[in-house]
């Protein structure tokens, strides 16, 4: 079936990769841009950019892109650090990483979690990559103040795994202009990450930003990846400690952490119950995704196991 790379729904005859309305949401035009690079060319360009130290930080390869939509051109081109979009290609180490990240971001949307704009996009050789719109720049290119929790807790990047989620919650409480709402949203995002096998949400994967230029608030979720199904050898369930541990987590551990940062138990209970009722929709989204059948089955099994573990203690 010919499906949209943005919403996963079927395309009409004559449409290619995107519905016009989906392309407009992601790229500002009903005509999706070209990605004029093959995977091998992207690897070569990425190596060049890394040598000039203009790559974006993080373990997963990331490239900064600009949309050139003038003089009849409609292409995404690789730039230095401050492009409009961030692109993540396929990797040799972990298969289907772009597809996994994109569907996990879709699940976050179904869960009511605010995320950055995102989509899959096809390269010139037909392979798929993941693309997201930056939120630390305005449409005119002006910088929006944004700090991750390495910066906010004054830790160097190499210490991004040396902290706790309780520390993040207390830092949100200290700096956010919407501290109670953002603490709740942070805890819900953390529970979602556990349910979806994301054990790589370290200090740099949460941020505060100031879209109005004055007030710092929790940034939309980004870098949501089900690491557990692509790297089952890693038995840790979270990147940082929660209630003093990273694995064998229970619902009680989340409630204990929530209590420390002032979140009522009832708020979390209500949301978990709603998510469990919505699990068939989550699985339907995975079924519609671009994952292989094997990877879809792994995702279903992990969701079932994690939901069972949390709800049995309610």
Question: PLM features: residue spans?
Answer:
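Regulatory N- and C-terminal appendages and interdomain linkers associated
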Residues: 1-50, 216, 260, 284-314
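Mobile late-domain/C-terminal helix-loop "cap" segments
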Residues: 243-304, 310
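ATP-dependent phospho-/nucleotidyl transfer catalytic cores
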Residues: 124, 129-195, 240-244, 256, ...
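C-terminal regulatory or interaction extensions
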Residues: 143-144, 150, 225-233, 262-264
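Conserved kinase catalytic-core segment
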Residues: 93-109, 164-230
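Conserved ATP-binding subdomain of kinase catalytic cores across diverse folds
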Residues: 42-162, 218, 266
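Active-site activation/catalytic loop segments of kinase-like enzymes and analogous catalytic loops
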Residues: 65, 226, 230-248
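A residue-level signal for conserved active-site and pocket-lining positions in enzyme catalytic cores
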Residues: 65, 108, 149, 200, ...
């Amino acid at each position: 079936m010919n499906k949209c790379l943005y919403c996963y729904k079927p395309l009409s005859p004559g449409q290619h990769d995107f519905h016009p309305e989906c392309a407009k949401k992601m790229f500002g035009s009903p005509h999706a841009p070209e990605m004029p690079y093959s995977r091998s060319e992207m690897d070569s360009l990425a190596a060049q950019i890394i040598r000039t130290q203009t790559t974006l930080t993080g373990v997963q390869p990331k490239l900064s892109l600009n949309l050139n939509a003038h003089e009849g051109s409609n292409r995404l081109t690789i730039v230095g650090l401050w492009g409009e979009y961030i692109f993540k290609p396929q990797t040799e180490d972990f298969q289907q990483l772009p597809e996994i990240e994109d569907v996990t971001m879709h699940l976050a949307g179904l869960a009511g979690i605010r995320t950055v704009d995102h989509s899959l996009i096809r390269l010139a050789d037909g392979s798929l990559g993941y693309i997201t719109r930056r939120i630390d720049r305005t449409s005119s290119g002006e910088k929006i103040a944004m700090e991750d929790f390495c910066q906010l807790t004054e830790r160097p990047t190499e210490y991004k795994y040396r902290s706790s989620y309780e520390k993040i919650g207390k830092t949100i409480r200290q700096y956010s202009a919407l501290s109670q709402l953002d603490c709740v949203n942070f805890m819900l995002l953390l529970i979602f990450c556990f349910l979806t096998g994301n054990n790589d949400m370290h200090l740099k994967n949460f941020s505060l930003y100031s879209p109005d230029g004055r007030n710092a608030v929790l940034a939309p979720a980004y870098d949501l990846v089900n690491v557990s199904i692509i790297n089952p050898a890693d038995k840790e369930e979270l990147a940082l400690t929660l209630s003093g541990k990273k694995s064998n987590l229970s619902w009680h551990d989340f409630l204990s952490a929530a209590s420390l940062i002032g979140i009522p138990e009832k708020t979390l209970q209500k949301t978990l119950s709603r998510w469990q009722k919505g699990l068939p929709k989550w699985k339907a989204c995975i079924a519609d995704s671009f994952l292989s059948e094997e990877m879809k089955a792994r995702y279903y099994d992990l969701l079932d196991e994690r939901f069972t573990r949390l709800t049995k203690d309610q």
